[in-house]
């Protein structure tokens, strides 16, 4: 079972009935250039979260015509899960980031945030509040797997969050013959990790069907540059990739980073 994590995480934010609150996954899907109904966001858009999805949502909002897109994140940049280049590109496109801030409530055209401070590596409330003008709010607090269909199966157990499935080293759940991997098990959520889970599970499934145990072979030796015996070593500068000008980038969904060749 490898169904991914496609459900947006929910958070309870006190809001007026007229407040416009969206989840980032649905927003990005609706914002697709082939979609007939583009989201109506207003002039000022707030994005709650600090991951790559939050960066994508903020940059997409700018491309849909928002005058201002601001990210609200409860920790500092050092602890932000988004890739460094994603944050750099978002900032260069005019996205504002409010660090150490958490949303307390939302009204029709404004958001109240509480400032945080880092104490012993943790973000804690300060009791200091700030009001930010915003016409809409996009929640980008991560995704989770829809694992409800597994909860009636005896033997399958879940982590504390109730959405990730516990597996043994062979990628098998507590029910014999049911294996799981990817975003629905405790791990880093990357394509590389999910691909590795698939390969590992396939080998163990094959062994289980044969009523045997898969034994992992020894790792191949690591070949360093010294062992390659390359007769030359260049000190040439790294070739820079061309970037689309910021003024044009925020008006299009085209690639903004070109390849190494033209």
Name the predicted role of every residue range.
Residues 36-66:
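Rossmann-like NAD(P)H-binding beta-loop-alpha module
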Residues 57, 181-212:
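A conserved FAD-binding loop/helix module that cradles the flavin
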Residues 1-30, 257, 261-262:
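Glycine/serine-rich phosphate-binding loop and adjoining beta1-alpha1 elements at the start
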Residues 17-43, 120-188:
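FAD-site-proximal beta/loop scaffold in flavoenzymes
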Residues 16-31, 37, 79-108, 113-114, ...:
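N-terminal glycine-rich dinucleotide-binding loop that anchors FAD/FMN and/or NAD(P) in oxidoreductases
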Residues 89-92, 102-104, 109, 200, ...:
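Mid-to-C-terminal Rossmann-like scaffold of FAD/NAD(P)H-dependent oxidoreductases
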Residues 58-103, 215-227:
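Rossmann-like dinucleotide-binding cores of NAD(P)H-dependent redox enzymes
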Residues 1, 107-131:
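Conserved beta-strand-loop-beta-strand element in the redox core of flavoprotein oxidoreductases
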């Amino acid at each position: 079972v490898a169904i991914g994590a496609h459900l947006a995480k929910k958070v309870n934010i006190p809001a007026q009935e007229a407040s416009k609150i969206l989840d980032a996954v649905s927003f990005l899907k609706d914002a697709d250039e082939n979609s007939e109904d583009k989201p109506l966001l207003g002039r000022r858009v707030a994005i709650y979260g600090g991951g790559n999805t939050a960066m994508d949502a903020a940059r997409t909002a700018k491309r849909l015509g928002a005058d201002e897109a601001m990210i609200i994140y409860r920790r500092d940049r050092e602890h932000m899960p988004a890739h460094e280049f994603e944050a750099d590109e978002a900032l260069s496109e005019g996205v504002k980031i409010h660090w150490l801030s958490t949303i307390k409530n939302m009204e029709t055209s404004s958001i109240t945030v509480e400032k945080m401070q880092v104490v012993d590596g943790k973000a804690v409330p300060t009791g200091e509040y700030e009001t930010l003008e915003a016409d809409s709010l996009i929640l980008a607090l991560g995704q989770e797997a829809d694992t409800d269909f597994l909860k009636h199966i005896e033997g399958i157990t879940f982590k504390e969050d109730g959405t990730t499935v516990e597996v043994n080293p062979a990628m098998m759940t507590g029910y014999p013959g049911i294996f799981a991997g990817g975003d629905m098990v405790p791990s880093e959520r990357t394509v590389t990790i999910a691909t590795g889970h698939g390969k590992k599970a396939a080998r163990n499934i094959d062994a289980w069907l044969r009523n045997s145990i898969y034994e992992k072979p020894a790792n191949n030796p690591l070949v360093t540059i010294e062992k390659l015996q390359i007769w030359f070593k260049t000190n040439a500068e790294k070739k820079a990739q061309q970037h689309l000008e910021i003024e044009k980038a925020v008006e299009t969904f085209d690639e903004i980073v070109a390849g190494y060749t033209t």
